[in-house]
Amino acid sequence: MSEKTIYSDLKQLGSNASIPQNPEDAILERVANPQAGTPYCVRFTAPEFTSLCPMTGQPDFAHLVIDYVPGQWLVESKSLKLFLFSFRNHGAFHEDCTVTIGKRLVELLEPEWLRIGGYWYPRGGIPIDVFFQTGAAPQNVWIPEQGVPNYRGRG
């Protein structure tokens, strides 16, 4: 008989899970934080995030940086990857994509703090950067700068 662990209820990790057709169908999974009560920051970086323009259907590209200070829960990284991939065929503006990702994670994890930076590549000659966070960053945790430089063309 196998012993139940914090990973026992995960459905996607270790299985052949397909990319959901859209973000609404994506299942984000969480695991109990074995270091709950210890203040620390978790960072996920998605340098090749893609979605579709809802008007033209053309692809949009972004560099996403997600930082959070966990409470009782951690996001399972394969489920996060599949959730982010589900935006590939989803039409929404940059602001909607970025804030939706942040809100879904907050709803799932109930973190002490979370922020997401969406650094979108230019469309129509204008880069769009979108930032969402749940409040002031905790003072007792090292939270590095996101480190994504401002977009700069020639010059």
Curated annotation (Swiss-Prot):
The gene is queF. One of its GO terms (molecular function) is preQ1 synthase activity. Catalyzes the NADPH-dependent reduction of 7-cyano-7-deazaguanine (preQ0) to 7-aminomethyl-7-deazaguanine (preQ1). One of its GO terms (biological process) is tRNA modification. Signal peptide: none annotated. Belongs to the GTP cyclohydrolase I family. QueF type 1 subfamily. This is NADPH-dependent 7-cyano-7-deazaguanine reductase. It comes from the Bacteria. Keywords: Cytoplasm, NADP, Oxidoreductase, Queuosine biosynthesis. Disulfide bonds: none annotated. Its EC number is 1.7.1.13. Substrate binds at residues 75-77, 94-95. GO terms for cellular component: cytoplasm. It comes from Brucella anthropi (strain ATCC 49188 / DSM 6882 / CCUG 24695 / JCM 21032 / LMG 3331 / NBRC 15819 / NCTC 12168 / Alc 37) (Ochrobactrum anthropi). The active site is at residues 53, 60.
